[in-house]
Amino acid sequence: MQIAIALVAAYLLGSVPFAMISSKLFGLADPRTYGSGNPGATNVLRSGNKKAALVTLIGDALKGWAAVFIAQRMGFSDNVIGLVALAVFLGHLYPIFLKFKGGKGVATAAGVLIALDPMLGLAVAGTWLFMAYAFRYSSLAAVVAAAMAPVISVLMHGGNGQTVVVGILGMALIGKHWQNIQRLMAGQESKIGSKKKA
């Protein structure tokens, strides 16, 4: 029963839509109505409000980190902690509070990885930052970082249970970016910092 409660709580925490909350706090339009339509930090940045985007980024990352950190402190096994990590991530992707239409999961995945293994999380975040700086496409950076995450995990820890969780997170994140991948291939993807479209 305790495990079930932990998983439900993690999912509900993941469902908290910080993009919506920060947009309301800063008097912005619903992020689902402009840009990519994605309720995430990159799309909120398209509103031109960097503070709102930062609040969204921190909030989304923090909920992923908090769910795993609390599960660790409660003494759950590694397998259960892995399930909690997946639950909070899926909560962000398919939030009950937004009719199961959530964000892409980049910030939440980063928070999860940092809680699971700080060095792994920082390595993956570093991959994202390098790609984002070099090419100015958040989606490309996310896809490359997601693909590299399980590879980095294998190099650091071998094919253990954590690597399986990281692999599932990576595949789900890439899947959520499928339309972005198509736009990248067509040369139609918006770059980081581009303003919202009317």
From Swiss-Prot:
GO biological process: phospholipid biosynthetic process
SMART domains: G3P_acyltransf (SM01207)
InterPro entries in UniProt: G3P_acylTferase_PlsY (IPR003811)
Membrane protein topology class: Multi-pass membrane protein
Sorted UniProt keywords: Cell inner membrane, Cell membrane, Lipid biosynthesis, Lipid metabolism, Membrane, Phospholipid biosynthesis, Phospholipid metabolism, Transferase, Transmembrane, Transmembrane helix
Disulphide-bridged cysteine pairs: none
Family indicated by similarity: Belongs to the PlsY family.
Protein name in the entry: Glycerol-3-phosphate acyltransferase
Phylogenetic placement of the source organism: Bacteria, Pseudomonadati, Pseudomonadota, Betaproteobacteria, Rhodocyclales
